[in-house]
Amino acid sequence: VIAQDIAKRFNVPYYNRNLIEEVAKQNNFDTDNIKDYDESPRKYLFSRTVQGYSNSPEEILAGLQFDFIKEKAASGESFVIVGRCADYVLKDMDCVASFFIVADNEAKLQRTMETKQLSQRDAEATIKRHDRNRKTYYKDHTDMEWGNSKNYDMTINSTVLGFKKTADIIEDFVKTKLTEGYLKFVGKYMHRWLQDNPQEDENGKPMEMG
């Protein structure tokens, strides 16, 4: 809900489960054949890696998704994405803001029961399985801890703030960080341009970027 709200505020694409459809379309896959492997940990018992290549469908799909994310970002397109190790995949880019949204267990349980129409017992099992898979998936592909605040720009408890206030804070942060990232990008570009095209100031001295 929060991620979708942010995407609407900035009028940019939103990627979550629908990323599967984009990857399938790009690689001529049948969505139904790969959707079960989305953000799933690799099943080591049934897969192997030979000379750097894996036959694991989970690994293959993850690689295709990471490539899609990188290509979109490199093209200059702005977007909001949930999960898929995007914070790690795009860690070397300036104009990226990453957030980890947490919620109290009771709030997560209630929302899961309502949105998925599940009993309390089934909702608890769903949350536990989802978090376990996300944690393993993130660790497998980044060698870092899922949810560790050091890996994100900001960690926010949406139960305390509510969805709207959480989205407000994210919007303000993104506007600030992306402005700084843009200025940094322009600075790098101008520095390279001056190296290739030396200029002199009014006193005849070479112009340099600070």
Predicted regions and their residues:
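RNA pseudouridine synthases
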Residues: 72-79, 83-93, 97, 111
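Small-molecule kinase domains that catalyze NTP-dependent phosphoryl transfer to phosphate-bearing small molecules
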Residues: 40-47, 119-164, 190-194
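ATP-dependent small-molecule kinase phosphotransfer cores
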Residues: 18-78
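Conserved nucleotide-binding/hydrolysis micro-motifs of P-loop NTPases
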Residues: 86-87, 102-108, 160-162
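Conserved phosphate-donor/acceptor-positioning beta-strand/loop module used by diverse small-molecule
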Residues: 92-114, 120-130
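NTP-dependent small-molecule kinase module
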Residues: 70, 143-209
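Post-Walker A helix-loop "phosphate-sensing" segment adjacent to the P-loop in P-loop NTPases
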Residues: 9-15
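Glycine-rich phosphate-binding P-loop
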Residues: 1-6
